[in-house]
């Protein structure tokens, strides 16, 4: 293990030997003293240039640590965060989770919830209105959420939503067929091995 009071500066070059006798060498990107966790930036294992591996090393399982090059100057400043972008993303995530919770509490079928998620991936302007899915304030999809349940003013919005619903159910059906054939294959294999 590393020496009891040892700290590592960000940017320092460190070499260590793990309990599995593996030699690791890299640049310190973070060090948490209470948990004795060291994050090292090492050359990419894939060999790709401009790529690196980040390894988390628990110093409690390291037999030897050597500081090859200690960084004495102050580390570069942390990258700035776009706080408004993060807040917007958090707000959207919250709205999405509340929408899912509403659908569950309203007793919407699993198929309806899955269709809503599929539509929402393509068209963000969709919401629940009781058990109905409302898309772009123009198209309403009522239970059981099939193509024929899509109602609205004839036009491109209605046609586009119908295509999404159609494709969703085609994909669901092909997934069911694939699962059935895999289950049958597994049954055949287990019957042959018995």
UniProtKB/Swiss-Prot annotation:
Q: Which UniProt keywords apply?
A: Cytoplasm
Keyword Cytoplasm assigned? yes
Q: Where is this region: Disordered?
A: 175-194
Q: Name one GO molecular function term.
A: RNA binding
Q: What are the AD domain coordinates in residue numbering? A: 79-173
| Subcellular location, record wording | Cytoplasm
User: Which InterPro entries did the record assign?
Assistant: AD, Lsm12-like, LSM12_ABD, LSM12_LSM, Sm
Q: Where is the Sm domain?
A: 1-71
Q: Which Pfam families does this UniProt record tie to the protein?
A: AD (PF09793), LSM12_LSM (PF21166)
Q: Which GO terms describe its cellular component?
A: cytoplasm
Compositional bias (Polar residues): 176-194
Q: Does the keyword Cytoplasm apply?
A: yes
At the top level, the lineage of the source is Eukaryota
Family assignment from sequence similarity = Belongs to the LSM12 family.
Which function does this protein serve? Nicotinic acid adenine dinucleotide phosphate (NAADP) binding protein.
**UniProt-recorded name of the protein:** Protein LSM12
Organism annotation:
Gallus gallus
The gene it comes from is: LSM12
């Amino acid at each position: 293990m590393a020496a009891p009071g040892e700290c590592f500066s960000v940017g320092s070059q460190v070499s260590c030997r793990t309990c599995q006798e593996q030699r690791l060498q890299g640049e310190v990107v973070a060090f948490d003293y209470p948990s004795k966790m060291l994050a090292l930036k090492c050359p990419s294992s894939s060999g790709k240039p401009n790529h690196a591996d980040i390894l988390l090393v628990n110093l409690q399982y390291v037999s030897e640590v050597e500081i090859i090059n200690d960084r004495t100057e102050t580390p570069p400043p942390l990258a700035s965060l776009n706080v408004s972008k993060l807040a917007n993303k958090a707000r959207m995530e919250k709205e999405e989770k509340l929408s899912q919770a509403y659908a569950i509490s309203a007793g919407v079928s699993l198929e309806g919830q899955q269709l809503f998620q599929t539509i929402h991936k393509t068209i963000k302007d969709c919401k629940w209105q009781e058990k109905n899915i409302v898309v772009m304030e123009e198209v309403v999809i009522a239970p059981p959420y099939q193509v024929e349940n899509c109602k609205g003013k004839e036009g491109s919005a209605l046609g586009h939503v119908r295509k999404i619903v159609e494709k969703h159910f085609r994909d669901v059906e092909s997934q069911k067929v694939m699962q059935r054939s895999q289950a049958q294959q597994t049954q055949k294999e287990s019957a042959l091995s018995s």
